[in-house]
Amino acid sequence: QPAFSVVTRPTFYKLLKAGRDIGYDGTYTTSEDEWIANFTTGWSDQLSRRLSTRLPRLYTRNGKIVRICPSLEYLFLEASEPFTSRGITRHVAATTGCVQDLGTDLDFIRPGGAITGLCS
């Protein structure tokens, strides 16, 4: 059983050009023009800073790997277009974190919608 779960809601989506760094010290760099979803949760919500480079990678329906990039206040998750996630369908365990029970139908997450199951 997970020790805790995080429930968060996307607050906005932004199209970033290729080569744009996200997070402290450029934790993630866009390799192409990408939509990024912003979730208002992070270290201030007691997510350990040790998770910074150890958070799981999420696999999407099209097989693309998505990286969660926490910063002081936010989690960033790649999105395919405004107001639409790529539909997280499974989890992959990481060293100190996992994503669990996210369901199979998250294709349409708008600001105010919820994503659950990030655990450590």
Swiss-Prot record:
InterPro entries: Ala_racemase/Decarboxylase_C (IPR009006), Ala_racemase_C (IPR011079)
Alphabetical GO biological process terms: chiral amino acid racemization
The EC number(s) this enzyme carries: 5.1.1.1
Pfam entry (one): Ala_racemase_C
Cofactor(s) essential for the protein: pyridoxal 5'-phosphate
Catalyzed chemical reaction(s): L-alanine = D-alanine
UniProt keyword list: Isomerase, Pyridoxal phosphate
Summary of temperature dependence: Optimum temperature is 37 degrees Celsius for both directions.
Role played: Highly specific to D- and L-alanine and does not catalyze the racemization of other amino acids.
Subunit structure: Homodimer.
Record-given protein name: Alanine racemase
Native source organism of the sequence: Penaeus monodon
